[in-house]
Design a protein with these regions (language model features):
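Conserved HGGG/HGGXW glycine-rich cap/lid loop of the alpha/beta-hydrolase fold
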Residues: 9-50, 68, 89
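Active-site loop/oxyanion-hole signature of alpha/beta-hydrolase fold enzymes
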Residues: 39-69, 83-85, 106-112
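Gly/Ala-rich beta-loop-alpha elbow adjacent to hydrolase catalytic centers
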Residues: 71-76, 80
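Flexible "cap/lid" loop of the alpha/beta hydrolase fold
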Residues: 85, 89-90, 94-130, 166-170
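Conserved strand-to-loop "acid loop" that flanks and positions the catalytic carboxylate
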Residues: 93, 183-192
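Conserved loop-alpha-helix segment in the C-terminal half of the alpha/beta-hydrolase fold
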Residues: 190-218, 236
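Catalytic histidine-centered segment of alpha/beta-hydrolase-like enzymes
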Residues: 214, 218-227, 248-249
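Post-His helix in hydrolase/transferase enzymes
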Residues: 223-239
Length: 251
């Protein structure tokens, strides 16, 4: 976990949760843009499964005081969907090119329902047992599948930092979704080669998103390639949370 604290006049703390095949550095450009205005926490997502990942995030949230905006990238959306129900301090969710499953739904279910993404064919399993494996993106496939709008050097850095996700994380069913009770925002690119646009659109509308932003030509690596769009979405959520409540006196 990395934490950057500021005197933020009771603004919400922004907790950033990375997805599979990456680490917290995916958020670096976002952190640079927000650190002067918000207390930021970059969570270390274990990538071991829906339950352990959500439990890890929920434990971190218990150490955070005041209102929280949970921001998930890619598979990190599964973690915020589940952990968001475990803390009364979570006030909003932001899905950045992210998965937002329903109860009993897995990431694999979503990909099966909306085929067309290239991620599944790009995965290389490293068996842990007869039934379990760590999943990696095959060498040389990162740029095209995850980060096509990044320069090659940036995509190579992303690949060098790749962290595997446990196979059970993608097949495990989700719990009660926090997006059913919390305001939520979605931002994603229309050139995401790993998550089909139809899936992004479906999730955002199913969740009743306050706002949906689609970034032209953007890949899955939105926090790196389009950090301004991500930050604008987070700021929009924060503004809604900090609007004064009118004092209405009954007649």
């Amino acid at each position: 976990m990395s934490r950057v604290e500021r005197d933020t006049d009771n603004k919400p703390t922004v907790v950033l949760v990375h997805g599979a095949f990456e680490d917290g550095s995916i958020w670096d450009p976002v952190v640079e843009r927000l650190l002067s205005d918000y207390t930021l926490v970059v969570a270390a997502n274990p990538l071991r499964g829906v339950d352990p990942d959500s439990a890890s995030l929920a434990a971190l949230l218990r150490l955070t005081d005041g209102p929280i905006i949970l921001v998930g990238h890619a598979y990190g959306g599964v973690a915020i969907t589940n952990a968001g129900c475990r803390s009364g301090d979570v006030k909003a969710l932001v899905y950045v090119s992210a998965l937002a499953p329903e109860r009993h739904e897995s990431a694999a279910d979503l990909f099966e329902r909306f085929p067309g993404g290239r991620l599944q064919d790009a995965l290389a399993p490293a068996p842990l047992s007869d039934e379990e494996a760590d999943l990696y993106v095959k060498p040389g496939r990162d740029h095209a599948v995850l980060a096509a709008d990044l320069p090659e050097a940036a995509a190579l850095r992303l690949a060098a930092r790749q962290r595997p996700v446990h196979s059970g994380a993608l097949s495990g069913p989700s719990g009660d979704p926090a997006w059913r009770r919390l305001p939520n925002w979605f931002v994603y690119g229309d050139a995401d080669e790993s998550v089909p646009s139809a899936l992004h659109d479906f999730q955002a509308h199913r969740a009743g998103a306050v706002a949906i932003r689609v970034v032209d030509g953007a890949s899955q690596a939105l926090p790196l390639s389009q950090p301004d769009a991500v930050c604008q979405t987070i700021r929009a959520a924060a503004r809604v949370l900090t609007l004064p409540v009118p004092n209405i006196t009954p007649d």
